[in-house]
């Protein structure tokens, strides 16, 4: 997934994943598999063609054991946004070619408004959230994940409105709600209820919400 993203799965691990896919189907909870090829021994423009073949071979392995949704992660990584958008485009095309695979999900470098200057992703333009997401305007079916205005941000109408009307050209966010995860403070557990302080009632202008346990 991350540090070993170039390595294909052995048969025993594929069987474990097949069982997880089946457990998801049985519980009406879709299993999605993610790859992060931008951090450890990252894909580059010079290795792109060979690395794309490796990624697709791995996707084929997972498809053959029942995985029907895939996630491409670029969070907390360096590199230029054009390379990330290029890989999104090619993997989106692979997903579409299968006919029964759900839309590709993408976790961007700018996964929250606060992340806009955490890496030098720009291609010469000003580093703004809107300029970042312009690189994905030609990929309307790729689902863009978003944690809000900051890493651990509540699901609020304001951030969905910002994403749709200011940060993108009418796209709806697929929110990655960083709750009740506690990796920003290992000294305590998040034990409170998920009330309106975490998830506002009556939300609109969003594609979906997943929580991070």
Regions found by a protein language model. Name each.
Residues 1-51, 55-58, 64-68, 96:
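Feature activates predominantly on carbohydrate-active enzymes
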């Amino acid at each position: 997934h991350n540090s070993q993203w170039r390595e294909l799965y052995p048969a025993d691990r594929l069987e474990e994943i097949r069982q997880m896919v089946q457990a998801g189907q049985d519980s009406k909870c879709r299993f999605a598999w993610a790859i992060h090829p931008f951090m450890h021994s990252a894909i580059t423009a010079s290795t792109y063609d060979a690395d794309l073949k490796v990624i697709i071979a791995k996707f084929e392995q997972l498809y053959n054991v029942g995985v029907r949704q895939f996630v491409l992660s670029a969070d907390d990584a360096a590199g230029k946004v054009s390379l990330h958008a290029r890989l999104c485009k090619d993997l989106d095309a692979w997903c579409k070619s299968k006919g029964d695979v759900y839309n590709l999900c993408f976790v961007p470098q700018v996964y929250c408004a606060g992340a806009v200057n955490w890496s030098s992703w720009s291609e010469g333009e000003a580093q703004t959230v809107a300029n970042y997401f312009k690189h994905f305007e030609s990929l309307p079916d790729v689902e863009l994940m978003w944690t809000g205005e900051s890493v651990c941000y509540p699901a609020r109408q304001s951030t969905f409105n910002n994403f749709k009307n200011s940060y993108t050209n009418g796209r709806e966010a697929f929110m990655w709600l960083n709750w009740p995860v506690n990796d920003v403070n290992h000294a305590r557990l998040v034990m409170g209820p998920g009330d309106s302080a975490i998830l506002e009632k009556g939300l609109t202008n969003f594609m979906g919400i997943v929580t991070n346990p």
